[in-house]
Amino acid sequence: MTDAQMADFGAAAQYLRKSEKERLEAQTRPFDIRTECFVPDDKEEYVKAKVVSREGGKVTAETENGKTVTIKEDQVMQQNPPKFDKIEDMAMLTFLHEPAVLYNLKERYAAWMIYTYSGLFCVTVNPYKWLPVYNAEVVAAYRGKKRSEAPPHIFSISDNAYQYMLTDRENQSILITGESGAGKTVNTKRVIQYFASIAAIGDRSKKENPNANKGTLEDQIIQANPALEAFGNAKTVRNDNSSRFGKFIRIHFGATGKLASADIETYLLEKSRVIFQLKAERNYHIFYQILSNKKPELLDMLLVTNNPYDYAFVSQGEVSVASIDDSEELLATDSAFDVLSFTAEEKAGVYKLTGAIMHYGNMKFKQKQREEQAEPDGTEDADKSAYLMGLNSADLLKGLCHPRVKVGNEYVTKGQSVQQVYYSIGALAKSVYEKMFNWMVTRINATLETKQPRQYFIGVLDIAGFEIFDFNSFEQLCINFTNEKLQQFFNHHMFVLEQEEYKKEGIEWEFIDFGMDLQACIDLIEKPMGIMSILEEECMFPKASDMTFKAKLYDNHLGKSNNFQKPRNVKGKQEAHFSLVHYAGTVDYNIMGWLEKNKDPLNETVVGLYQKSSLKLMATLFSTYASADTGDSGKGKGGKKKGSSFQTVSALHRENLNKLMTNLKTTHPHFVRCIIPNERKAPGVMDNPLVMHQLRCNGVLEGIRICRKGFPNRILYGDFRQRYRILNPAAIPEGQFIDSRKGAEKLLGSLDIDHNQYKFGHTKVFFKAGLLGLLEEMRDERLSRIITRIQAQARGQLMRIEFKKIVERRDALLVIQWNIRAFMGVKNWPWMKLYFKIKPLLKSAETEKEMANMKEEFGRVKDALEKSEARRKELEEKMVSLLQEKNDLQLQVQAEQDNLNDAEERCDQLIKNKIQLEAKVKEMTERLEDEEEMNAELTAKKRKLEDECSELKKDIDDLELTLAKVEKEKHATENKVKNLTEEMAGLDEIIAKLTKEKKALQEAHQQALDDLQAEEDKVNTLTKSKVKLEQQVDDLEGSLEQEKKVRMDLERAKRKLEGDLKLTQESIMDLENDKLQLEEKLKKKEFDISQQNSKIEDEQALALQLQKKLKENQARIEELEEELEAERTARAKVEKLRSDLSRELEEISERLEEAGGATSVQIEMNKKREAEFQKMRRDLEEATLQHEATAAALRKKHADSVAELGEQIDNLQRVKQKLEKEKSEFKLELDDVTSNMEQIIKAKANLEKVSRTLEDQANEYRVKLEEAQRSLNDFTTQRAKLQTENGELARQLEEKEALISQLTRGKLSYTQQMEDLKRQLEEEGKAKNALAHALQSSRHDCDLLREQYEEEMEAKAELQRVLSKANSEVAQWRTKYETDAIQRTEELEEAKKKLAQRLQDAEEAVEAVNAKCSSLEKTKHRLQNEIEDLMVDVERSNAAAAALDKKQRNFDKILAEWKQKYEESQSELESSQKEARSLSTELFKLKNAYEESLEHLETFKRENKNLQEEISDLTEQLGEGGKNVHELEKIRKQLEVEKLELQSALEEAEASLEHEEGKILRAQLEFNQIKAEIERKLAEKDEEMEQAKRNHLRMVDSLQTSLDAETRSRNEALRVKKKMEGDLNEMEIQLSQANRIASEAQKHLKNSQAHLKDTQLQLDDAVHANDDLKENIAIVERRNNLLQAELEELRAVVEQTERSRKLAEQELIETSERVQLLHSQNTSLINQKKKMESDLTQLQTEVEEAVQECRNAEEKAKKAITDAAMMAEELKKEQDTSAHLERMKKNMEQTIKDLQHRLDEAEQIALKGGKKQLQKLEARVRELENELEAEQKRNAESVKGMRKSERRIKELTYQTEEDKKNLMRLQDLVDKLQLKVKAYKRQAEEAEEQANTNLSKFRKVQHELDEAEERADIAESQVNKLRAKSRDIGAKKMHDEE
């Protein structure tokens, strides 16, 4: 379509198709199909990328965001050429894969082209904004257009369906599917808008209606949407206008394609939203529209405010939506009601019920006092809702709180709890809303129903998309099940039926399984014993619960179906009970409340009120409601009444869904897939993973593949022959008969098309995608040619007729002129005047006769027309009714067929089950006999146990009596405690007064006083209860002995019962397994039950008896549990004996429970066995289920009680232990306090005031005493601990003394070693100073050397630049030379050999230099920052390396001796270090303890003084009392005695501390001696180190001489370099001469430049890679010689270049292969280099760590001289560090050896052809490296050697840094050269592009010139024809005139 044609779409054109300019730009965009690709990405699924390289099945690509990735080659997917950008049909993509489809959709979406074809269906992406693509202009533009003639659009899909309906005479359907928020509802509205616009009823006069508000049928169809959306749409998390119901809209058309009528079917209204919404969601729109206050009269009528937060049902989530104007929507809804011809009463009824639901949510109820029943908490809202519903408020509240329930044949009033009332209100509100919505749909259908004839229909399906929420319930299962069925229908239609059609037609086709079969999931949900079936079955049983439903699901499906899984519950999320694997993902479902939702129960009392409501609409809604009891009573009237009342929600949904699928299968479906681009509702943003998930789930990619692989278009042979015969009429002659198939074969065979694009079936010809469009284009072109020819002939004929008319006119004019002249001559005759008067009169008479005849004929025709119209209307009405009946009959036949199939399957299954069950019944009868025998035995055992239980009960009764006595005594003691606490309250007041007087001591003593008061209370109570408790203990001990005997008997009985219990449990397990297998099958076997009736009745009676006994035992267990609880609480407050007794009682009760449990287990076994046989009768099913539920509850309760009792036992044991501890403490306190308390109680009556004051003082004393006792206890514990530690120390000291005696023997040797170390340290310090001076000079020398080195490297860089230039020129000349070498093959072979040799040499040099550079670069990169600090160590290590080479043998001997001594000293030092550490820690501990004890002693002394002062005060106060002085004196003496004891204990502790201090002092002295010895040894080591430093200085001198020699060798290398520069200059001159010669041959080489450029690029890459690798001078000289030889050869062969071009091309290919090989080798070397760098980096970091640790060790060693303990720790660390360094050193030595060995090999290979000077230098380098290696080996066992190896590494680091700088310079030079080369290439490419553009311009001008010449020729021929024609006309005129 051109831009001019797209102008018909108006402003929507830019949103539908790219302009011609954009298409042209896209086609001319640069694109390389080899490199442009898609690569996988973790975040974006796929990203665009360019291939950088391919190697070994791996591809390296650079993504569009600059990231480089390496992936497998099969993961790379090619991009489509630019002309396919934003393609409208993705089936036409060249490369069809996931990223191509994704990016096509993404690019179109970015341009706001939201519709895209995908094979046979359409994909639409939600734009989240308004686009102008749905106006009337666009509708008109799409009308009658073929799919290929217009851009993709929902209107195009709709028009195609409309055209198919008319041409194929078949019903159509449009299935709009997608996730929630993808835009399904909007597209549905657009489809309806399109049909209403293009297929409106033709005659406008018929649309006129006397009722102005009703509107036309198309208006009513369009206005049905706003009405339904107001009541059925709501805001959700993902969509602001989400349809919460599904709808199938059928638009009926007449035979001519005009609208006839419409109807709507709805599915699954989400009625739970009426009473509950999530936070981010809201209720249905109608509630907020009413509350928007746009129509205030509505608020007054409904008695509501305009604040949504006043109503609970509508304010749980959000109350407003930014994208929706509720007030405007209210007007739209109200006007929609008017257009749909709702009456005012109906509208008011709908609004009233909506308002009543809001008032329902505000009704409040509360619980009656002392009852569980509910009563109203205010009646205002109930009054409002009752008024709006036309009810009585009191009756409504009564029905809610006290509903009438039918029990048997009578009705009983039942009281409801508050929760039950609220649940009932919610259920009623949901039911009212749902029934009102369904009534609205029925009412709208009645409006849309017309008497017009209906021939066909187009159905539009808009149903809720697949839903996966955090909380998925029954509604989500129904919605997802519906989507599963629709997806299966899509898959079946697209994949299965399509391929079955091919096989049926006999086309060669291999069946492709696209893996899209969803039948397993569908069967899991809907088949017998599926989820829905089990749910409906559970709803039939009154005792069933959600958990029994879950258990059945698990039993039937877990592990048996792959689609049914156990969920993974995550903390923080809602609990899930099972998971289903749907096509769109795995969904976790929560089954809570499913049974209630499925049964959907209502309060039938309130429903009865609804049925009698004065509001007509309310009574209508519930007029058809029938409960279970009404169903029973209505048996006689109608058989279906009862069945309908028991129909569950799931069954109703399945029935509606099956009808929908049946309807869809009879239509031709058109699929529209809606895609949600992102979760944020952001326009223009596409989330790639989200879109890819939807594409995979929706089968978009599979649809495209089947469209491309299969044959989506097919035509019957007859239709094809009739339509396309025009393409070649000669192939099918008209005169003879030819079979339609043969005619089609001949016709297609004669056409110029791809004959693999179609296949012939038995009845149809099949076409691949696109071929039918091509045939249509050919047909249109043929028709246009034929029509053009016809038009030409017609125009010619018309012109000839016109010419003839002109001639006739001319002749007529001549005749008229002659007649006029004649008339003018006779007009005045009298006879002529008479003629003029008579003539008109004759004609008027004739016309009157004709008019009369016509009127008569008109009357007859009018009568006939009226009769035919009446007859036609009757026939049309009959036809409509017959069609409806036919459709209904078809549905019934289909349903009957399905039922018949199900019945047959069930019959077969029942026959099989019957055989199995008969065999199992026999087994069961045998087992029943065995069980009866076992039952008899168990009953006997049970009697014995009952006897034992009775005996135990007697014992328990006795125990209960004793417990009752204990309880009474406990209460008495508690009363006494209360009295005492009252008295103590008075004491507390006095204490408070005294504490005010003693403010200084308030904070310290207040808490102690309170604690003491509480203890005194306890003492009072305990002393009083002690005597009584002792008596009770004696009684309890006697009963305890009896209980022990009973316990032993019970133990024996328990063991016996446990054995029996195991046997019964095994038999129970077997029976349970059999029961689960037979449960469902035995329901359908009624005819076998009669044989077992008598046995069942007996068993039932026995079960009832056992059940009664079980209840009695259970009651008895509960009583025992209560007794145990009471006993547990009492045990918490009594002593050890009571706790022991309670434990014994608990064990007895536990044994009793076990004995009772055995009987209960037996009862359960009998009951289960009874339940299995009772299941054989349907009448006993309910009783069996009740027994099972009761048994399960008892089992659970019993298990819970046993577990609880076990926990109680554990708790009581813990409490018992705690009480035992408290008892022991209390006994100790009682012994101390009882005497004091007795004396205080005696003195209390006489001296109350004095006693209180004295008691206060005594309390203070006691507090202090307790503190003293605690501190004394602490001291005693510390003393005991110190004594043990002293004992340990004494033992250790003895060992140390023995060890010291051994150490003293080696003391002399150690002291000598320490002196040596000190001397070494001093020498090393002096050497450091000397080295510092030497460092400055060496730095100066190093700077000079660095400058020389830099100059040398600059010169080397210049050499490299010249060399690279020469190499490039040589490569150019070599290519030219090779092109001309056709006649000199022998010379070319020699050149090839030389080139191969050069390449080999280059590779060897590359390997050598690469190895050397890698080692140097690695060491340099890391240690660059530390080079200044490490220079001293470098010089020192160089000097040491030279000097130590001479003294190696002597030093090795000395080193071995020192090593031995060092190890011995280290071991001794370790032991002494450990001893020192332990002694120091002990010393610190003792010091701390001593200080603490001193502090305590001081505090005690101060407290003693205070106490003495207070005692003196008390004695004065006691003097006044007189009588109690003697008693108080005793108390004082006791306190003094205790004080003296404390003092003596403190003195003993002090003495022990002094003793320990003496020991510690002795240990310190010994420690100081050891430290002094160690210091002396360190001094000796320092002296040795100084000596080593002096040796190092001598080595530095020798290294200086070697450096001078190195400088001289470098100067010699500079001289050689300068000489080579001169040689290179001469070669440049020669090359310039050769260039002048070569310029003459450039003209002949243009044809081969394209090949040479690629080769040149590859050679340049190889040269650059070699330049990066530091080539040496020998290779440069050898190449120069080769270059001179080649230049001479090139001069000789320049003239022959043209003849040798063809041979050179072949040689170029071989050379490029060699270059690629070289490049791959270079890359491998570089990778190896990087690996070695990383290894060396790791080694360097480890060495750095070792150096740092060594430095830390040195500092710690210095500190060790001043602090022995710290020195020992640092020595230990030094020892660990040295061991670590030794290991590191060995690894470093091995690594350096490997690297050195490789370096030597590389240098030997690289320096084969070098000069002697270079060989000397390399030999010198190898000598130095050998010396370094020897030095590293010699110093391997000591820390000194480690430091020297580190310094050597630093030297290498410095050298590497210099080499790195040189390499950087070389790299810069190479980069400059590469830039120049790129510039030359760019210039050449620009010239080539300019040439191409000039050539294209020339071709264009040439083409235009040819066209102009053709036009001139055509014009000239036309002029000649016109001239000839004019000459003929002139001649003809001349002839006529003659």
UniProtKB/Swiss-Prot annotation:
Q: Cytoplasm: is it a keyword of this entry?
A: yes
**Can you tell which superkingdom this protein's organism belongs to?**
Eukaryota
Q: Tell me the keywords, alphabetical order.
A: Actin-binding, ATP-binding, Calmodulin-binding, Coiled coil, Cytoplasm, Methylation, Motor protein, Muscle protein, Myosin, Nucleotide-binding, Phosphoprotein, Thick filament
Ranges of Basic and acidic residues compositional bias? 1925-1938
What Gene3D superfamilies does this protein map onto? Answer: 1.10.10.820, 1.20.5.340, 1.20.5.370, 1.20.5.4820, 1.20.58.530, 6.10.250.2420, Kinesin motor domain, Myosin S1 fragment, N-terminal
Region described as Disordered: spans on this chain: 1909-1938
- An MF annotation (GO) of this entry: actin filament binding
> Which residue windows are coiled coil?
842-1938
Domain Myosin N-terminal SH3-like: start-end pairs = 32-81
Gene Ontology cellular-component terms for this entry are:
myofibril; myosin complex; myosin filament; stress fiber; Z disc
Q: Which parts of this chain are annotated as the region Calmodulin-binding?
A: 790-807, 816-833
Q: Which residues carry this modification: Phosphoserine?
A: S417, S1090, S1139, S1271, S1309, S1512
Task: Indicate the principal place this protein occupies in or around the cell.
Answer: cytoplasm
Family matches, as SUPFAM superfamilies: Myosin rod fragments, P-loop containing nucleoside triphosphate hydrolases
Q: What SMART domains does the annotation carry?
A: MYSc
Myosin motor domain location is 85-780
Q: Which residues form the IQ domain?
A: 783-812
Task: Please tell me where ATP binds in this chain.
Answer: G178, E179, S180, G181, A182, G183, K184, T185
Kindly list the positions at which Phosphothreonine occurs in this protein. Answer: T379, T1277, T1284, T1311, T1515
User: What are the start and end residues of every segment in region (Actin-binding)?
Assistant: 657-679, 759-773
Task performed by this protein:
Muscle contraction.
The record's note on its domains: The rodlike tail sequence is highly repetitive, showing cycles of a 28-residue repeat pattern composed of 4 heptapeptides, characteristic for alpha-helical coiled coils. Limited proteolysis of myosin heavy chain produces 1 light meromyosin (LMM) and 1 heavy meromyosin (HMM). HMM can be further cleaved into 2 globular subfragments (S1) and 1 rod-shaped subfragment (S2).
Oligomer and partners? Muscle myosin is a hexameric protein that consists of 2 heavy chain subunits (MHC), 2 alkali light chain subunits (MLC) and 2 regulatory light chain subunits (MLC-2).
Report the protein name in the record.
Answer: Myosin-6
